[in-house]
């Protein structure tokens, strides 16, 4: 996969070189280019914004800068070659991981889009965009080329978004119902959520197959050694060795956490009779944890 990020703060994207994303770069599963938008500014001050038509506070990012930048990055031509190509922040130890040792091959998730597949995907983080979901992350993990446009101030001139549809599949996307200073933080969030689902990035594919939202529910609590810590003990069922009971307990904990934190996720969800009985018990307030 190829990621390109256009921003006025290239240094903000340095975290893309670290941890698993850095390792993915090292393994040639991922390449990342970071482009300074000001390279496409033509005035002496390298300005990228101007006052809004109709008045109002703040500044709007100029189409005369964004248009050429997106044109060049789409085809990696012109000034796009001046962008920084990120290397892994450190050399990682190359040792066999879980899936390699177990002979597990993960083919990846199905792509959501087939039409216009020859066009790169342009993601524009904005509070006015559609909510970013785990389903999006799965679908976009199949993309060959994703370009991020990081807005600032009052955002990017809307004509840039409309014009970009000639060259890109454009998606305006939001990571939550709040406002950030710029799009860079959202890019880090989306990039990490997407890249970790590329086959070979995680050492154990079950790590993301058991994630929150992978089956529509939130993931339940996790525990490790020691069994007792500061007067708190690990639930007995997890040390019982009874895998069927452990699996059922984890399922119920996932249902419980979803009911307590995001009950709307249960609306319309297809549950088996055991799940239905447990959720009904939660609604009535008479379901206790099964720790035995």
Swiss-Prot record:
Subcellular location: Cytoplasm
Keyword Nucleotide-binding: no
Pfam families in the record: tRNA_m1G_MT
Annotated GO biological process: tRNA N1-guanine methylation
Residues that coordinate or bind S-adenosyl-L-methionine: 151, 175-180
Catalytic activity: guanosine(37) in tRNA + S-adenosyl-L-methionine = N(1)-methylguanosine(37) in tRNA + S-adenosyl-L-homocysteine + H(+)
Domain of life: Bacteria
Gene3D superfamilies assigned to the protein according to its UniProt record, in alphabetical order: 3.40.1280.10, tRNA(m1g37)methyltransferase, domain 2
Keywords assigned: Cytoplasm, Methyltransferase, S-adenosyl-L-methionine, Transferase, tRNA processing
Annotated GO CC locations: cytosol
Any one Gene Ontology molecular-function term assigned to this protein's record: tRNA (guanine(37)-N1)-methyltransferase activity
Record keyword Nucleus present: no
EC number: 2.1.1.228
Cited NCBIfam families: PRK00026.1
Family: Belongs to the RNA methyltransferase TrmD family.
Function description: Specifically methylates guanosine-37 in various tRNAs.
Assembly: Homodimer.
Name of the molecule in the record: tRNA (guanine-N(1)-)-methyltransferase
Organism: Corynebacterium diphtheriae (strain ATCC 700971 / NCTC 13129 / Biotype gravis)
Source taxonomy: Bacteria, Bacillati, Actinomycetota, Actinomycetes, Mycobacteriales
């Amino acid at each position: 996969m190829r990621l390109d990020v256009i921003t006025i703060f290239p240094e903000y994207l340095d975290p893309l070189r670290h941890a698993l994303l850095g390792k993915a770069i090292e393994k040639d599963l991922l390449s990342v280019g970071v482009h300074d938008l000001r390279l496409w500014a033509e005035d002496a001050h390298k300005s990228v914004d101007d006052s809004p038509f109709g008045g109002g506070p703040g500044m709007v990012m100029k189409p005369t800068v964004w248009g050429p930048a997106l044109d060049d990055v789409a085809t990696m031509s012109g000034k796009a070659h001046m962008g920084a190509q990120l290397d892994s922040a450190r050399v990682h130890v190359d040792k066999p991981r879980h899936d390699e040792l177990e002979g597990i091959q993960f083919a990846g998730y199905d792509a959501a889009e087939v039409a216009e597949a020859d066009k790169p995907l342009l993601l524009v983080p904005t509070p006015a965009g559609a909510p970013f979901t785990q389903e999006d992350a799965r679908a976009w993990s199949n993309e060959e080329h994703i370009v991020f446009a990081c807005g600032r101030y009052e955002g990017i001139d809307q004509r840039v978004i409309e014009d970009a549809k000639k060259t890109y599949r454009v998606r305006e996307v939001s990571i939550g119902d709040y406002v950030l200073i710029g799009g860079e933080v959202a890019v880090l969030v989306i990039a990490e959520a997407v890249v970790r689902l590329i086959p070979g990035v995680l050492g154990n594919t079950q790590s993301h197959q058991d994630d929150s939202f992978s089956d529509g529910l939130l993931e339940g609590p996790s525990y490790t050694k020691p069994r007792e810590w500061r007067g708190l003990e690990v639930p007995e069922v997890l040390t019982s060795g009874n895998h069927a009971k452990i699996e059922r307990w984890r399922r119920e904990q996932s249902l419980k956490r979803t009911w307590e934190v995001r009950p709307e996720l249960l609306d319309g969800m297809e549950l088996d009779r055991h799940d239905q009985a447990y959720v009904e018990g939660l609604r009535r307030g008479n379901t206790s944890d099964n720790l035995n």
